[in-house]
Amino acid sequence: MIMYPRKQQVAGKSWSGLLKPFHILKGISFVGTYQASIHLIDTGDGLVMIDTGYLNTFYWVVNGIYSLGYRPSDVKYIFMTHWHGDHVEGVKPMLTLAPEAKTVIGVRDDKRVFERYGIKPDIVVKDADTLTCGDITFRFVETPGHTVGTVSIFFDYPESGRTYHVGMFGGAGRGALFEDNVDYYKGSRNDYFNSLARLKAEKVDLFLGNHCWNNNTDEKAAAMKANPEINPFVDEKEFYRFLDYCYTDVKERMKREGLTE
């Protein structure tokens, strides 16, 4: 399977690329779109929602939650991996349906998400912080680069006699690392490379994509439907292949543009 580059036919169209909601594991689900990944984690005592997607596809997310047998009010926490709109625009409408839910973001993105979207996070996490909901403890790792406050998320998930080591790179996009991008900040490439190195030390055998093109979410969903006996999301090498891809992709663009750092 060739992985990672996004599909051009839906690039830039947040309302396109609707995916049927599905279970990655029995307790880990996808309810997003091709353009904006959204995951639900069933902790045994409510749901954790990782990112909320765009405002104009929020209806699809809500329908997806119900279609999988949950209710929006089951959401106890909303994790924002970084402040960009494709990850946070759905936060405010989600809170109207889950008013008791607590919002969570990385310490260096909290001001920006408030300035841009009026979201005042309930919990601001820093490197190595943990948060327990139900039976699951989530660990946050600061991985700046895509934004200065990007956080990646790791947790162990027990199911069917096995414990899965689940991980998500909270901001893998490389466009923001270059000066022609509105979200570029000085030092972002160096931060990004350091983040990649840190992430390589994590143990991950179930990689959740921060976007579908991070791990070919859509193709894996189709493969699971065709053969439910094999779960293509379970792969002890894929996370590291993706990190290598990210590193090479940035280095190649730097070379093309004559950049040394």
Task: State where each predicted segment sits.
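Acidic/histidine-rich helix-loop elements
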Residues: 4-5, 11-17, 52-55, 116, ...
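Conserved beta-strand hairpin/beta-sheet module of binuclear metal-dependent hydrolase folds
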Residues: 14-68, 152-174
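Divalent metal-coordination and catalytic microenvironments
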Residues: 27, 41, 51, 82, ...
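Active-site HxH/HxHxD metal-binding segment of metal-dependent hydrolases
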Residues: 28, 56-59, 66-130, 239-242
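Short, glycine/acidic-enriched loop or turn micro-motifs at the edges of active sites
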Residues: 30, 45, 54-55, 85, ...
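Loop/turn elements at helix/coil->beta-strand transitions in domains of secreted/extracellular proteins
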Residues: 46, 73-76, 99-102, 136-137, ...
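Metallo-beta-lactamase
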Residues: 54-56, 130-132, 137-241
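C-terminal regulatory/interaction regions
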Residues: 236-261
